[in-house]
Amino acid sequence: MKQIDLKILDGRIGNEFPLPAYATEGSAGLDLRALTESALTVAPGQTVLIPTGISIYIADPNLAAVILPRSGLGHKNGIVLGNLVGLIDSDYQGPLMVSLWNRSDKPFTVEVGDRIAQLVFVPVVQARFNIVNDFAQTERGEGGFGHSGKQ
């Protein structure tokens, strides 16, 4: 298991609320919690930025982290990430914040400590461009959206 530096920014972590942890041996994501001062109601159509109480420093340029929605929040309550996916670069050291967007038609209350998103570490390949006039021919070629069919 890869070791990542984590800084606790809110003293409630480790006391009232646990550090982010994998729920099972097969879990890909670690749950991030809402570390607000009090409950927060998100109105329909509103987007809010919520602190998680932690910062991380990945340090390895071959890794990044992504903040992803929790499936139940989106499916059951219409709560998704305001930026759809949050990308955490390996050299970022600031606080992890979660942008929540209420796309439903009902207010949604986020309680202090609620699990609101998940953090997943992913491999990164930094590429260098090779300028060419033409590409090698493929069966697909320039076929774009819908090119491969529906079934």
From Swiss-Prot:
It comes from the Bacteria. CDD domains: trimeric_dUTPase. It catalyses: dUTP + H2O = dUMP + diphosphate + H(+). SUPFAM superfamilies: dUTPase-like (SSF51283). GO terms for biological process: dUMP biosynthetic process; dUTP catabolic process. Its EC number is 3.6.1.23. Keywords: Hydrolase, Magnesium, Metal-binding, Nucleotide metabolism. The keyword Hydrolase applies. Its cofactor is Mg(2+). It holds the Pfam family dUTPase. It is an enzyme of class 3 (hydrolase). The keyword Transferase does not apply. Pathway: Pyrimidine metabolism; dUMP biosynthesis; dUMP from dCTP (dUTP route): step 2/2. Substrate binds at R70, S71, G72, N83, L87, I88, D89, M97. Belongs to the dUTPase family. This enzyme is involved in nucleotide metabolism: it produces dUMP, the immediate precursor of thymidine nucleotides and it decreases the intracellular concentration of dUTP so that uracil cannot be incorporated into DNA. This is Deoxyuridine 5'-triphosphate nucleotidohydrolase. It comes from Actinobacillus pleuropneumoniae serotype 5b (strain L20).
